[in-house]
């Protein structure tokens, strides 16, 4: 068996998330169908760097999988996967990795981006690719709130109640908001890991602060109290993208 690492992109609109689920269309199941075909119909189970929820997209999700036989030509394998997967999945790169390399458990950092349209009327052409908020937002307040998220914190207060992870301490290296134009914002979060719905809960809270319905100091209160009830609503999934996964062998993490 030979282990391969692949970088993939997908439009999450019509998926029930990344991870396999019974009677649901998922990214993992669609790719595994093609991998099994390429593996002489012997089942292949892939592993991802992490899950994304229904409606969430990815520019750079990373997976690994094992195929029997000799080492494949990497570009031919990438091309074979890319042309046989559905139109809402793209296989960007395939690499050879050691047999013990693991997409989830290798030390890595992740970058998420969140795109928000802020206008009186919503663009129908962006309804699957950006979230929407029609009310006024104070950019400076949102910048200040985002800066408070940087560093090592216990993010229990920004985690969905369904999280099964015991250790909720994570480090955020970058939390930034960029005004793309008069009607569009981009949020950037880069860290050593993120909890279930953490990014969307942070965005929902910052939006509420930007709309003057919470003080900037609410971020401190949420982090200190570890109480989800003090945070804002969970932001919509369509604005969220897994931008990049960087592993320790090619970064300074």
From Swiss-Prot:
Keywords: Isomerase, tRNA processing
Residues that coordinate or bind substrate: 112
EC numbers: 5.4.99.12
InterPro entries: PsdUridine_synth_cat_dom_sf (IPR020103), PsdUridine_synth_TruA (IPR001406), PsdUridine_synth_TruA_a/b_dom (IPR020097), PsdUridine_synth_TruA_C (IPR020095), TruA/RsuA/RluB/E/F_N (IPR020094)
GO molecular function, one term: tRNA pseudouridine(38-40) synthase activity
Reaction it catalyzes: uridine(38/39/40) in tRNA = pseudouridine(38/39/40) in tRNA
HAMAP family: TruA
Family named by the database record: Belongs to the tRNA pseudouridine synthase TruA family.
Name of this protein: tRNA pseudouridine synthase A
Gene this protein is translated from: truA
